[in-house]
């Protein structure tokens, strides 16, 4: 039986427990033995990490020690898959630049509503936007058959590099209150090879409502299976 390690924690606003619980039954149905950990400390357990086929991480704005990151990266290089969504994977460990290099993208911001529409809640950052499939995405097993779709949620502005295989993008518009003066396109779904391991990232998934969106849920399910050893 294959093994999946779910590592969750960090900022509660991303509902790490509720969102990961959505996918645990799916993973079990697909033949995985599931272990759940509430911190990245398990990454430093070399003997255990060597047995893991897939890591699903939802751990936002946390920190990782040198030993923990080394264990995580060594496992991925050896063939363990690594996947997740939103800040749980793309805004996990700002203290470790090597993690950002391995992942291929880092959340920078999520430009929100017009200032006069903001009320001091998370919804200030929920804006309507489109997830646009790339030519690669139209034919990739993770996103094949899924058309461009609309969401009203946080729209991630991502710092990234050209080593990613980008399956979908989203474009930040230019609005009167924003400081930039041309549109910015960021990857919203990408994959990346690191050693023998495969990495899957989708930046949608701010909360339970968004991971339950049929398109987002399907992409996450396919992405996790794709990344697995």
Predicted segments with their positions:
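Helical hinge/lid and interdomain linker segments adjacent to catalytic or ligand-binding clefts
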Residues: 5-6, 12-92
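Oxidoreductase and adenylate-handling cofactor-binding alpha/beta cores
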Residues: 99-106, 148-165, 220-229
